Regions:
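Enzyme catalytic cores with a strong preference for nitrogen-chemistry domains
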Residues: 1-152
Length: 152
């Protein structure tokens, strides 16, 4: 797991990287798998296989999404808290588009926005949907919007 510890970020003050090993937790009387390499498929949509990575994973040289795609993921979801800085929005957009092109998949990027509670950084909520290198939908920065796109 990737934790940022550079520039404005210092996540390692509060968190430590988790184990890459798979495990389970008890929830609602059921064993629920947990881990960094889970893939979710849909019985009703043959080619739909979804994987997730977290924020910093996209920004490192070898993101978990590479292994997810090699294992069959067709959609990668990234849950993020990426702040705003001059030029960062276009760089973030290029990262998402590039990753979707490189992995030949859809890449959904959802970042913190309006209502984020931290006082040290500003979060603009730039949410993106890209497929095979093309950005299909993008929210306006500092607007509370829902993005929708058809992924083929």
């Amino acid at each position: 797991m990737n934790l940022p510890a550079y520039n404005e970020f210092y996540e390692t003050r509060h968190f430590m990287s988790g184990s890459a090993d798979m495990g389970t937790v008890q929830f609602g009387g059921e064993e629920i798998p947990v881990g960094t390499n889970l893939l979710f498929s849909c019985e009703n949509v043959a080619d739909l296989c979804v994987a997730a990575e977290i924020c910093e994973d996209l920004w490192v040289p070898n993101p978990p999404s590479v292994q997810h795609a090699l294992a069959g993921a067709s959609v990668i979801c990234n849950l993020s808290a990426s702040d705003e800085m001059v030029g960062k929005g276009s760089y973030r957009r290029d990262l998402v588009a590039g990753q979707s092109a490189r992995l030949v998949c859809a890449y959904l990027y959802a970042t913190a926005g309006e209502g984020e509670s931290i006082t040290d950084l500003v979060f603009g909520g730039q949410n993106l949907i890209a497929e095979n290198g093309t950005v299909l939908a993008e929210s306006a920065t500092f607007e509370n919007e829902t993005n929708v796109a058809t992924i083929d």
